[in-house]
Design a protein with these regions (language model features):
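Gly/Ser-rich "nucleophile elbow"/oxyanion-hole loop immediately N-terminal to the catalytic nucleophile
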Residues: 2-17, 155, 160-163
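Structured segments of extracytoplasmic/periplasmic soluble domains
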Residues: 3, 31-34, 87
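Surface-exposed acidic, glycine-flexible loop patches that form ligand/cofactor-binding
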Residues: 5-11, 33, 54-59, 147-151
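Short beta-strand immediately N-terminal to the catalytic nucleophile in serine-hydrolase-like folds
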Residues: 15-20, 43
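Extracytoplasmic/secreted proteins, especially bacterial periplasmic and envelope-associated proteins
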Residues: 26-27, 83, 137
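Catalytic active-site module of serine/aspartate enzymes centered on a nucleophile-bearing elbow/loop
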Residues: 112-167
């Protein structure tokens, strides 16, 4: 009942957290552009590298989007995720932080990465951030950190290729 409005005819979207991994994170982030939600947690994504919807106006404020991925994930090495995170405006809420080097509360940033050893396996890297219990503190942060506590704005990442579409 806590997720239904008083008449029980619709969801109380302000209580809903959308989350997904890979393409599921893309779907979550894209949905939140149209419907204001409590927050969006994107694991290994969003991955819509050739589109520009990420920079469109959003029903969900940008400080409510959180991302976490592995640096060997092909979506990261090909600049898909960093591009999406920049287009979503996440640099306004703190720097890119490696959770292996910076601990909770991760500078109140919305952009978290890990370089945990996956034996150089990009496929393993893609799903590891949702499978390995070693990141319980990260998950708790992503799902419960107060959205009004934000890191300081930083410039966009000059190493992130923003134009991925071929000419």
């Amino acid at each position: 009942e806590r997720f239904l409005n008083e008449k029980q005819t619709d969801l109380r979207w302000d209580k809903v957290i959308l989350s997904g991994s890979s393409h599921g994170s893309t779907t979550s982030a894209r949905f939140a552009k149209h419907q204001k939600v409590a927050r969006v947690v994107a694991f290994a994504g969003p991955r819509d590298q050739l589109e520009s919807w990420q920079s469109l106006p959003s029903a969900t404020p940008a400080n409510r989007y959180f991302g976490f991925t592995h640096v060997l994930d092909k979506g990261w090495t090909a600049d898909h995720y960093c591009r999406s995170w920049q287009m979503l405006g996440l640099a306004k809420f703190g720097p890119l932080l490696n959770v292996e080097k910076v601990k909770f509360p991760f500078g109140n940033s919305r952009r978290l990465i890990t370089d945990f050893d996956v034996d150089g396996n990009a496929n393993k890297a893609h799903g590891i951030v949702v499978r390995d219990g070693r990141w319980k503190d990260v998950w708790k942060y992503l799902y419960t950190h107060p959205v009004d506590k934000m890191g300081k704005p930083v410039p966009t990442d000059p190493d992130c290729t923003m134009k991925i579409r071929p000419n």
